Amino acid sequence: MAKKRLHSFSWVPDLLHQKDNYFLTPVEKLAEKIELIANCPQVVYNQGELCSCTANAIGESIEYILIKGKKAVFAPSRLFIYYTERRMEGTIHEDAGAMIRDGIKSVNKEGA
């Protein structure tokens, strides 16, 4: 019988950074409704019990941007993103989740 995992790691909240910028817009300027489905990737990934939610979100975002921009589409390696973001955080030997900021930095530096 398979053992149930007892830990509940997932997304790790980002720490505030002096370079953070906040985007605010008046509510009246926002569209009432937008349709995003046309640009969504067709494959839905199941990360199972792996705590790689930030890597999956980043990989899906990359695919979305490529489809929307009518660029050559590829499936970014979610495991590579997960590994490199944990390497930045010093947790490569743990299934510890990661900060989305580190995932984005890792894609910028290492690729996907």
Predicted regions and their residues:
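Catalytic-core signature of thiol
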Residues: 1-112
